[in-house]
A protein has these predicted regions:
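Glycine/Thr-rich phosphate-binding loops of Rossmann-like dinucleotide-binding domains
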Residues: 26, 56, 82, 120-123
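Short, surface-exposed alpha-helical recognition segments that flank or form part
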Residues: 26, 47-50, 85, 89, ...
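Structural motif corresponding to the early beta-alpha repeats
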Residues: 51, 65-92, 116-119
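N-terminal binding-site loop/beta-alpha segment at the start of enzyme catalytic domains
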Residues: 1-74
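Glycine/proline-rich, positively charged
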Residues: 40, 86-134
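Generic anion/oxyanion-binding catalytic loop in active/binding sites
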Residues: 20, 48, 83, 99-102
């Protein structure tokens, strides 16, 4: 596996990462097998979008043994509400969703944070100049 410095972060990440959203279609055993194969192949970065809660639990259990060797990219700005993905900038919803991500992943940190679904310059301005960044 080849690795590159990720911008100015100091993180050396694999050129290939695991986009975990599609793991929603798989049970724990399949998630574990996929994540183990990625780990064995040298993949060390996992993008965990705020998707269906159970898949985040499965991912957390699957990476637990090697958590410190994975770079987790988590997303904020979306939540899971009533079985449906919901885009939101409401911190009263965003913060508990992020805390749930940490809990389900079995960790107290993520390595990289992404603001989910910034679709226009107006979205960007509202995020940068509003309470979302604070």
């Amino acid at each position: 596996m080849n690795y590159r410095m990720l911008g100015k972060t100091g993180l050396h990440v694999s050129e290939i990462g695991l986009g975990a959203e599609w793991l929603e279609r798989h049970n724990y055993e399949e998630c574990k097998a996929i994540i183990d194969e990625c780990y064995a192949s040298g993949i060390n970065i996992l993008d965990c979008w705020m998707s269906e809660p159970n898949v985040r639990t499965n991912i957390g259990k699957a990476i637990a043994e090697h958590r410190s060797e994975w770079y987790i990219q988590g997303h904020i700005g979306s939540t899971w509400d009533g079985g449906q993905y919901v885009r939101t900038r409401d911190m009263a919803k965003v913060k508990p969703a992020f805390e749930d991500l940490l809990e389900r992943l079995g960790t107290d940190y993520i390595d990289l944070g992404m603001i989910h679904f910034v679709d226009s310059e107006k979205d960007y301005e509202e995020i940068v100049n509003g309470p979302f960044i604070e």
